[in-house]
Amino acid sequence: MPFGQYDPLGQVYQCFWKNDIHAVVLLVPDAECWVYAGQDLRARYQRDGLTVVHLPMKDYRGAGYPKLRAAVDETLRLAREGNNIVMHCHAGLGRTGLFAACLAIRQLGLSGDDAIEWIRDLVPGSVESDEQEKVIREFALEDSGT
């Protein structure tokens, strides 16, 4: 999270511009941004011209399939349009890992278990709770029908 405890100077945010980022998938509630970053990140991103896909999830939790599917759909639409996208939660492991796994299910055709293994191979420690694993598996089952 830019300006959070792992990036108090906002160096990550500076990298957004260096890497031509156009959109942000924000996976934390607005209140959590205030607690950890001391500001309304969603409003800042929008004010600075970034497109925001907001899928607020509590720490170690997930989201229901309809909201998760809508956020995945919107993220993939933005990517197909040529937008560079960054996604983040607080530490970049649980909720970010969950969302990345769901993108992999959709784009790579992975099963839920394979998507969890895939993201953990790339980012050790990703997907931090049993509930997050369950959400990923349910997304794979639900999404296979779309």
Q: Model-predicted segments: where are they?
A:
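Conserved G/P- and acidic residue-centered "switch" motifs that form tight phosphate/ATP-binding loops
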Residues: G92
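Cys-dependent protein tyrosine phosphatase-like superfamily
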Residues: M1-I85, F99-T146
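Ser/Thr-glycine-rich phosphate-binding loops at phosphate-binding pockets of nucleotides
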Residues: T96
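Short cysteine clusters
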Residues: C89
